Amino acid sequence: MKKIHLLYAVFALLFTGLTSCEDLLTEEPNSKYDRDRYFDSEDKAEMAVMGIYSSLSDFNHYGWYEMASPASDDTYYTARTQSDNQVHDIAHYQLNSTNTWIESIWKLKYEGIDRANLTIDGICGMTGYAENTRLKALEAEACFLRAFLAFDLVRYWGDVPFKTSYSSSYESAFGERVDREVIYDEIISDLTFAKNNLDWATASSS
């Protein structure tokens, strides 16, 4: 009988130890942020705005090329090499559906807009947003970048899919084409907000 009680005690200690060990070893991941809990400080709001610039600075975006550049007289491509065939096609207005460079530009425009949508939505939901001029300025910066990217889309492709809400799922990432005049109205609205809430640049601005 004593042996049975002893076994029960041993098993109880083992299970307790395993549970405690599991609790001790379970950590919150520090390598990524939870979107729903991310916007809790001005610093994180600024990081979100920097994420929009990260999309803009991609090699295939404004980091190196931009789609209009090869079609300008400043960088007119006359020769063909294996590395610049697709750029050459743009310069000579010989486009087709296999041009992955244009596909990359298309994706990066929407990536930047979606990041701007997430940033604007997150900032607007922050505690004290209504009275915080710093948050308003960060929102204005995101609005300007969204307008800038949307203007690129319209001047390249005319009527395109467009929305001002963040794509929270695969299904919500896609939509029908929107009339360019409607998109222009959104662009003007974003730029007006940016004009009214962004500080003027100074010699100390970075």
Residue ranges and their predicted role:
Residues C21-S69, Q94-L95:
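Membrane-proximal, proline-rich intrinsically disordered regions
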Residues K3, D34, S72-D74, S97-W101, ...:
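Primarily recognizes Gram-negative and organellar outer-membrane beta-barrels
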Residues D36, G63-D84, S165, D199-S206:
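Short, surface-exposed recognition loops and adjoining beta-strand edges that mediate ligand/DNA contacts
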Residues Y166-Y170:
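Short edge-strand/loop segments of extracellular domains
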Residues E46, S54-N60, Q82-W157, S172-D185, ...:
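Conserved, well-structured interaction surfaces
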Residues M1-N30:
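Bacterial Sec-dependent N-terminal signal peptides
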Residues C21-E28, Q86-D89, G158-V160:
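Short, compositionally biased low-complexity segments
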